[in-house]
Design a protein with these regions (language model features):
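Single-stranded RNA-binding regions, centering on S1/OB-family and related RNA-binding modules
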Residues: 1-234
Length: 234
């Protein structure tokens, strides 16, 4: 089970499920700082996330909810928005409440730090990584490339053929492959068009005289540009 995947990819893995069902295995995971995933059910009035660990209560304190929460560089919406979604974490402590029921203290921030140090910091331009689309804007798509750490894919890197909005290619929650385009000052930029084939590879799919359908992408006085594939227009 690889640890450094977009959030939501580990939650259904059998190893992850087995650990969540065992206090002993949760203790072992604490000692090894293993990254796990479970669903965040509630965000309380202090912005702590309550996580369901197969019937055991898990708590991610607000300041452990994401990198940047402690120093104020990231807003609390980064924590609040995780309700009803999978969250990654490492186990930091196992205690009991006043009734003797176990409470497991968790840190998403530590899981993200581990992902940054062991995985994302080692990525280089040209590397191909799994990613999950988290939200779309006019200027590009944001994608989780590991443990909830998000990178931007500018709209002009999504495909060779021009589009008006990333929603023409992606939907939120969609799993894709992405290419590391640049790494500058800790900020990662992604690209997708390199994975859609070259002009020649796309052109080989069509024959002269063949009737095909496409999308009109631009109209000029001298003609219209028709998209046949995301990386082929004529």
């Amino acid at each position: 089970m690889s640890e450094y995947l977009p959030e939501g990819k580990l939650i259904s893995e059998q190893e992850n499920i087995n650990i969540l069902h065992s206090l002993k295995m949760l203790e072992d995971a604490k000692n090894s700082e293993k990254i796990l995933e479970a669903k965040a059910c509630v965000c309380d009035s202090s912005h702590n996330l309550i996580v369901d660990l197969a019937g055991i209560k898990g708590i991610i304190p607000r300041e452990e909810g994401a990198i940047g929460i402690k120093d104020g560089s990231v807003r609390d919406i980064a924590v609040i928005s995780r309700v009803n979604r999978p969250v990654c974490f490492v186990v930091t402590d196992i205690t009991e409440d006043e009734n003797g029921k176990p409470i497991v203290m968790l840190s998403r921030e530590k899981a993200q730090r581990k992902c940054l140090d062991a995985y994302i910091s080692r990525l280089r331009c040209g590397d191909i990584v799994p990613a999950r689309i988290t939200h779309l804007e006019n200027f590009g798509a944001f994608a989780d490339i590991g443990c909830g750490i998000v990178a931007l894919m500018p709209i002009d890197t999504i495909s060779v053929s021009r589009i008006e909005h990333p929603a023409e290619r992606f939907t939120v929650g969609m799993d894709i492959k992405a290419v590391i385009k640049s790494v500058e000052n800790g900020r990662i930029s992604l690209s997708h068009k390199e994975l859609l084939g070259t002009w020649e590879e796309n052109a080989e799919r069509f024959c002269a005289g063949e009737t095909v359908s496409g999308i009109i992408r631009n109209v000029e006085n001298y003609g219209a540009f028709l998209e046949l594939t995301p990386n082929l227009a004529g």
